[in-house]
């Protein structure tokens, strides 16, 4: 009886020790929504996203003398497209195809530079996101949003530490997008 319980328990602990941590980072920034503009009733915008980063990695970390590449848990272009759709809907726009203004949200850079030693780690995260507004009348506007975030901690940087840094810089960028009215003014001038 004792062997029937002990053997599976020992095997379980041995296998658990071999498990590698996941190589994805849970990207879930806080979405800030802007104030509604009641004068926008009926204005439709179309929205799409693009990820133009040269490398899809969010971070590269050395663990057990090997470089581990960490990627996002979901496609960033769809995440940011969803964010922009929520922000435009909150402002009072309708989102759909063939609007008088097309918005494209582009991820140019999102990366966490992780440096770690024996007792400390540093995570320097940068985001560079652009929104290109193109009106049917030919007018065009590009607005860039940039943010950076640095954090230090003890020992080794975990996936959660890196995810928190990435989510923090994305949350700051999304808040900037929400507070900025330049795209909103461009749409108002070119959608009528």
From Swiss-Prot:
Q: Where in the cell is it found?
A: Cell membrane
* InterPro entries assigned to the protein according to its UniProt record, in alphabetical order: Uncharacterised_YajG
Main location (coarse class): membrane
In its keyword annotation, does this UniProt entry include Repressor? no
Keywords from the named record? Cell membrane, Lipoprotein, Membrane, Palmitate, Signal
Could you confirm whether the keyword Zinc appears in this record?
no
State the membrane topology: Lipid-anchor
What stretches pass through the bilayer?
none
Similarity field: To H.influenzae HI_0162.
Name of protein: Uncharacterized lipoprotein YajG
Q: Which organism is it from?
A: Escherichia coli (strain K12)
Q: Which gene name does the record give?
A: yajG
